Amino acid sequence: MQIPIEVDYIIVGGGLTGCALASHLSKRLGPSASILVLEAGPDPTSNPNSTSLGGGFALAGSELDWSYKTTPISSISDRVITLNAGKALGGSSILNYGGWARGDTSDYDAWTRMLDDKRWSYNGLLPYFRGSEAFNDAGANSEQYGSNGPMKVKSISGSDPKRKYPLREPLLKAWKEIGVERVPSNAGKLAGLSEFLENFDDGVRQPSHLAYDLSGVQVKTEALVHRINFEQVPNQEPRAIGVLLADGRQIKARKEIIIAAGAVRSPQLLQLSGVGPASVISRHGIPVIYDSPAVGQNLFDHFALFQVYKLRDPERGLSLGHPSLADPAFFKGMPVDWIVNEALPADQLKKALTEDGDPSDSHGLDDASRTHVETMVVYNPLAPGVPVNGSFIATSVMLTLPTSRGSLELASASPNEPPIIRPNYFSTAVDRAVLIHGVRRLLQALTFTQAGKDVVESEMSPGPGLSSLTLESSDKDIEDRIRAIGSPHYHMAGTCALGTVLDTELRVKGVQGLRVVDASIFPAPLGGHPQASLYAIADLGAEMISMAKEAKDTN
């Protein structure tokens, strides 16, 4: 399509959140409003990998992945991590693994306390959670779950009657043996074991640009934005009036510009536009529009340890690769049944907080209902060099509420050069204590309980110099393993946070006519997996924008 010279609204970023936001906004404002989505990557629709589960693995590192590189990270043995993020229409919805998991009520309520705005509480967001999903499992509580939203959501057991993984019941029993009780999925309480929910529709991925109706929106792909243009009038805050593309073209916005470029690109674009830490911006010869020190700060992610376990008597057909699990039903989503969320015991948490110099618990982690670690068992090894022959399973032990914080800043004044990313993973005593505890709990479930020992033989060493972990392994053994091979779930967030960079209406502080709507707005981490929250936030953001227009029109 030809890029228009002027529109009402420009959305920078046609990713997971940007497409949902555009769709909601077009429906709220009607056909009289012109909305333009600018996406740096291509339209992936013709690529079959963009709609299949396995395709998500194939797309990692491809031309549809930003593949950001971090700086060497001292807290994890100076390793450089490649961060996957979708570089295409649909963004990371073309390559994520489909987990549909809200955070705990207490996670969102912590936001509310930080922001003094109940719209960001769990109950405040619940209408938008429900509005985004079509979850029609038998017996679903209509007060918690939506049934008519654009995103079809299924439980494992509800996706196909033939999709009955043989490890489902043994794992349920193993976790129960160590005191983990089953709780409803996505109903505001994470603590316990719940069935995994996913947004694969009969085995087909639902990228946001296909799940959401964009018929009332203009979309331009392969359109990288260089900066936001501002109008500066004496005694007034600068107003965002348009964008400059990397190829030199300019587009004006009559009403608002919304940045939805993700936790890396959104703060980078603000800094390129002169909004951010003045010292960083001026270093690259960019005029400072507004000194906002928090832009690019507060970076966090769900850091995790991934492991492989060897099964006992694999001829029983317990994981993928065995001929008994060849039915297409077993490939309709992630081969997993349960997610387990637990808290670090209070005495260990208190000790770690004190070690971090935070005895008053500024993160609010000691709330009785909060959980700190999520564990999953996947019936596929998912590891290089490990055969998919029915003999192995993979596991993830993931920090849900990390206290480690990183940052990012411009590497240059060019939009084509990625920013300098310093994640600072696993750098606090709390994060170390939580992950070590989570790994021990998993070892206990799989190698100590009777139900676990019946199916699992042992944890596998990931390579030379690293011994297998057992319940007898020391905390240092586990910590060394995490430092050696731990990696994030690519749930980056926090770099344009509500309360510091943004007000609670998602407006960029210090300027007019500019908002941010994506994972960078998270003021603090959430449990669960972010996409369920992001689709809700897109709906809320569209409501805020449309209400602002109505208020202005009324005046």
Question: Residue locations for each model-derived region?
Answer:
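A conserved FAD-binding loop/helix module that cradles the flavin
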Residues: A524-L540
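Glycine-rich loop(s) and the adjacent beta-strand/alpha-helix scaffold that form part
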Residues: H24-L36, G41-S46, I228-E237, G242-M334, ...
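Mid-to-C-terminal "cap/lid" subdomains and adjacent gly/pro-rich loops that border
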Residues: S32-A33, P277-N389, T400, A429, ...
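N-terminal glycine-rich phosphate/pyrophosphate-binding loop and immediately adjacent elements
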Residues: Q2-G131, I289-A294, D301-L311, A329-F330, ...
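A glycine-rich dinucleotide-binding beta-alpha-beta segment and adjacent secondary-structure elements
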Residues: T221-N229, Q236, E374-V378, G390, ...
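Internal hydrophobic alpha-helix adjacent to the cofactor/substrate pocket in enzyme cavities
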Residues: G285-I286, R440-T447, A538-A551
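C-terminal segments that line or cap access tunnels to active or ligand-binding sites in enzymes
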Residues: N380-A383, S391-V455
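Conserved redox-cofactor binding core of oxidoreductases
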Residues: R113-E231, E237-A240, F306-K310
